Amino acid sequence: MEDDVAALVVDNGSGMCKAGFAGDDAPRAVFPSIVGRPRHQGVMVGMGQKDSYVGDEAQSKRGILTLKYPIEHGIVTNWDDMEKIWHHTFYNELRVAPEEHPVLLTEAPLNPKANREKMTQIMFETFNSPAMYVAIQAVLSLYASGRTTGIVLDSGDGVSHTVPIYEGYALPHAILRLDLAGRDLTDYLMKILTERGYSFTTTAEREIVRDIKEKLCYVALDFEQEMATAASSSSLEKSYELPDGQVITIGNERFRCPESLFQPSFLGMESTGVHETTYNSIMKCDIDIRKDLYANTVLSGGTTMFPGIADRMQKEITALAPSTMKIKIIAPPERKYSVWIGGSILASLSTFQQMWISKQEYDESGPSIVHRKCF
């Protein structure tokens, strides 16, 4: 690869797509992973109506569109729409010619083999990429924290995973997936705010609730005690001004919402919380590496951005682990984008340049080359 051509780094999440150039310290473009199509033909007369809209434009025109998320629970389920998102990423957001830049894509842990092949095929055949690579999201987050061994709790909008990684390689047998993430927390907050007498139901109102969640929610260190405090005083109450000027007050909902990460029963789910899932993941690993995982537990993704989450994880894992074990939870301030940042670091390493799958290799071997070169 020529050094003067910057590689592109594209992290496709269930909720947001993060894209930019290798070597940068933050993504240039962050937009919703949505594709919208007009509900009725010819509604927007003379507006040069497009047959589809992507990202923020789809979001702002949602009143006349049917919105679809092509990535569900971290896995691409609609390739036509996914192709539209990539097209939008290259041509509209980054304004680059994809045939001129190597591209690093990210994938969910345990992504099906056929999916990795399909991603590879689209990059080479549709976008004519000179070279590409597919990396596991959690592994990139670990790199971004300056480690090669540890366990990553990666929680985004559509899915959460606990991924133990040893010397740069994810251990597939010990990866656990939890279908509980940001979108579920937003839904739950909508529900409990309705119980307080506020009504949030439409997609537009859902965006407001997501904003309330991001600005006001936090994780309690001791849930029962926090509930008692909230009941006996108004010290935990905060007010929030809605776009129409109405002011609402939110109390114990602030910590009841993210508490579902630790008690999924709040959402009517029978699964274990994020702390127990992390512990179970560690216990599926060889006894000799557990110590390294406990001491390097890295939080990643937007749903780990709640204040108080690291202290609570520390407390919960300490309670589950052997009493002499040293436990360290690492919560980097930039963890919302650490997958992308890890990709930016990886793709700009001189030692990585031989790892790219080149167009030539693809032409010789076909899509299955991805399993030999990316692991």
Curated annotation (Swiss-Prot):
| Principal subcellular localisation of the protein | cytoplasm
Enzyme Commission number(s) of this protein: 3.6.4.-
Q: Which domain of life is it from?
A: Eukaryota
A GO molecular function assigned to this protein is: hydrolase activity
Q: How would you classify this enzyme at the top EC level?
A: hydrolase
A GO CC term attached to the entry:
cytoskeleton
N-acetylmethionine modification sites are M1
Q: Where in the cell is it found?
A: Cytoplasm, Cytoskeleton
Q: Residue positions of the PTM N-acetylglutamate?
A: E2
Q: Which family does it belong to?
A: Belongs to the actin family.
Q: What does this protein do?
A: Actins are highly conserved proteins that are involved in various types of cell motility and are ubiquitously expressed in all eukaryotic cells.
Protein name (database record): Actin, cytoplasmic
Native organism is Branchiostoma belcheri (Amphioxus)
